[in-house]
Regions:
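Conserved G/P- and acidic residue-centered "switch" motifs that form tight phosphate/ATP-binding loops
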Residues: 2
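Nucleotide-activated chemistry modules centered on ATP-dependent adenylation/adenylyltransferase
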Residues: 5-175
């Protein structure tokens, strides 16, 4: 992920370490925490290899520290993949006016994973590394979905799924 996702993961990691250190029987460490990565399958091979190495390091370090952090990589279904849509179906290359790839290659695969978790655990909480200061569009989106006085908001589509944006108020200089 980018800098915001990295900051979010770091904060979660530090919080889990603190819980483990300060609590005799840390019941908070019983639930699995998944670091999600969307593999669009069109990334430069050098970048893809680097991402795989970073994800492996996250998983290894989590096991060393006995933290319930697990890495999961999602991929689009074949019919939603970039090349099937561009070459096979004749879609234009994604642009600002027609961003079909975000839904097919990132949102749908992640949603499938979340639905599996909800089916297994009853609910899911998504921690998302978005900030109001990223852009006016991002600020509007956050404002539209936040509920004053509530940390968790209902996911707009997925049942029993909640969203938490703990770094939404941070400025660029703070990340």
């Amino acid at each position: 992920g980018g800098k915001d996702s990295t900051v979010l993961l770091t904060l979660v990691w530090l919080a889990l370490r603190k819980i483990k250190r300060d609590t005799i029987t840390p019941f908070q460490l019983r639930r699995s925490i998944y670091v999600m990565c969307n593999d669009t399958m069109v990334e430069n091979p050098i970048i893809a290899t680097y991402v795989d190495e970073v994800l492996a390091q996250i998983e290894t370090k989590a096991r060393e520290e006995d933290l319930p952090i697990f890495v999961r990589k999602t991929e689009p279904k074949l019919e939603d993949s970039f090349w099937v849509n561009v070459i096979g179906k004749g879609y234009p290359v994604p642009n600002t006016a027609f961003r079909w790839c975000t839904d097919k290659m990132k949102i749908k695969p992640t949603a499938r994973f979340i639905i599996e978790q909800v089916d297994e655990c009853g609910e899911a909480i998504i921690l998302i590394g978005t900030r109001k200061a990223e852009s006016a569009t991002r600020a509007r989106s956050i404002k539209k979905h936040e509920v004053y006085g509530k940390r968790l908001t209902n996911h707009t589509i997925l049942r029993n799924t909640y969203v938490y944006a703990p770094i939404k108020e941070l400025m660029l200089e703070e990340v």
